[in-house]
Amino acid sequence: AADMGLIITHHHAEPLGAEMFAQAYPDLEPMYSKYPEKFRALWQAGIDAQKDMRVVWNIGFRGQGDRPFWDDDPQYDTPEKRGALISSLIKEQYDLVRANDPEAVCCTNLYGETMELYKDGFLHLPEDVIKIWADNGFGKMVSRRQENNNPRVPALPAFGDTSAHGIYYHASFYDLQAASHITALSNSAAFVAQELADVLAHGADDYWLVNCSNVKPHAMLLDLIARCWRDGTVDAGQQCIAYTAAYYGLLHRCEIAQCLADYAQFAVPYGPHEDDHAGDQFYNHVPRMLI
């Protein structure tokens, strides 16, 4: 990817692109409090392996398997303790990256428990680290559902916050509940365009990271997101017609655009909210769980 000119970044559970502790040391408990030097060595190795590439360095600290770190280290039993450790480790990772490249761009995901810590004032970050806010997997900028717990905490910076902000937005999502993973998002293009206009209004315009999965089923939505990034506001209906003309040709562009609009209109609703529309995982995975 780097050889093709792409900028590299990292999953939020794998800061700095480093090897997971559980993979490097499968016989050890994945606890920073016990093995700080081993964690630091893995981070430094990740930096060294990518030091000649174009990288947006993702920094942060989650547990192994993409879960809260205190699931593995229960001594961190208060928000104050959890926020203090994550803040200190982010600063340490930031300093390691900047020692290699003083102009390096760093980001961190405000996702799940980290968003709660940040909003409650327990997470402190270097000023120029881009804070990445995530949608819920269905295009709405609120916290994601965890099984049947769905608090829908707003996931955008406050108006007037001039520090660096971006988003992690799902054109494709995987939750083994109701997500659209191998089929197009079940919410309308107009809904997505409005959400992204709101993102820009809140100042989250420094960095957009888009989960596009295997691309093909999500091509129209990716085109819409790209236009929102470039132009700020988009007429979703006109974008759909322009997309179908470019992708399928001029002859039947309006009929195809209507089919694409109808796809979202007739999606199965599974809840009371405007984004509660089921995708392919609802049909594939939920019956398996019931059986």
Question: What does each of the following model-derived ranges do?
Answer:
Residues L209-V234, N284:
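Aromatic/acidic polysaccharide-binding cleft in carbohydrate-active enzymes
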Residues G237-I291:
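C-terminal non-catalytic alpha-helical accessory regions
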Residues A18-E19, F69, Y118-K119, K140-S143, ...:
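Short helix/loop capping segments that flank catalytic or ligand/cofactor-binding pockets
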Residues M20-A22, G65-D71, D161-A189:
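Active-site clefts of carbohydrate-active enzymes
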Residues I182-V210, L224-W229:
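Catalytic-core region of carbohydrate-active enzymes that cleave or remodel glycosidic bonds
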Residues K131, V199, N211, Y243:
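Conserved, mostly hydrophobic/aromatic
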Residues A1-D3, L28-T162, V268, D275-D276, ...:
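Gly/Pro-rich turn-and-neighbor structural signature
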Residues A1-L16, L224:
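Aromatic-lined substrate-binding rim segments of carbohydrate-active enzymes
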